Amino acid sequence: MRHHLLLITLLFLAYSSYGQEQADSTLTTEEIQFRDSIAAINTNNERLQLIQETYNAASSAFAESNFSKSITLFDEVIVMDSSNSAAYYNKGLAQKETKAYALAIETLEQAFVLDTTNFDALFQQAKCYTNNKESQKAVIAYDRLLLADPSFAEAAYDKGVIFYLEKDYQQAIAAYTQAINIDPNYAYALNDRGSCYRALEDYDKAIADYLQATKQGDQAFLFNNLASAYRKSGNKEQAIRYYSKAIAVDPSYEMAYNNRGTVYFESEDYDAALKDFKAAIDLNSNYAMALCNRAAVYHLQEHYTGALADLQLAVKLQPNNATALLNRGITREMLRDVDGACQDWQKAYDLGLEKGNEYYINNCE
């Protein structure tokens, strides 16, 4: 009996299957096409979902600084979708983070080919050239970007930085001016153009640019630079004023304390100078320049042991600081350590400071 039941069941299933096949065969061409299109849509949706999930995983790996994993996952996205410009772009960024600059440049180029509105891809290419110390290629890349997008102020600014670091101040001024023409309120471009003018000893133009930069926001380094231009121009009062503004904005700005102290020193206000140098050293006990400056005040006050202590530390921090060695030699002589003084003067001369040789000849031969 059980065998008959099984047979009937099997026959029923077989007939049911046959009946389904017969039913399918009765679909019209339009119905079959509709069915197939739905299946294709479902398959494509699954593919798109997988691409998105893989892209998200790659982005998460990038955010976690796991750049190797990020590159692998972006490659998987590209295999599934070779026209995905964003995947190429972010893969290029990950390669840049691993310092694989040549590979990054190629990948970023592909990102731009796929999306010619992605000017950031060109910008990052230029960054790769800069990081790889290929400054000429970086400049060409920035020029290409500015030709494609004349409103990209940061490209002009970064080009200026390259020229500034090479001490090509006229070219730097031209690039910074290009950035400022795009964005008249570009504080960094105004500041850095001012620094070019300061290096060229055109202090009026430097002051004008620094003043304009400070109007864009209270940033301590802007006031510090403005003060330095006033100091270079001989306007000590304005220099002290703006160094004080820098300190007011950032009370932990040790450089501004040291610089203001230098102006006080030049103005022979040694008590105020000493106070500022001490403040700078309290903020940074390894600030060699401030140590040397405080030693100069101590020396004038005939506090030679204090001066020597500061200069000892300064030389320890900067063994090739010829001026610190010269001054330590002078201080050692005042403390009757002639042999130590002569050694310092000789080394200062060996480092290129002619004054060291003068002291050595006059006191050691």
Please place each PLM-identified region on the residue numbering.
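Bacterial Sec-dependent N-terminal signal peptides
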Residues: 1-25
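Alpha-helical tetratricopeptide repeat
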Residues: 19-365
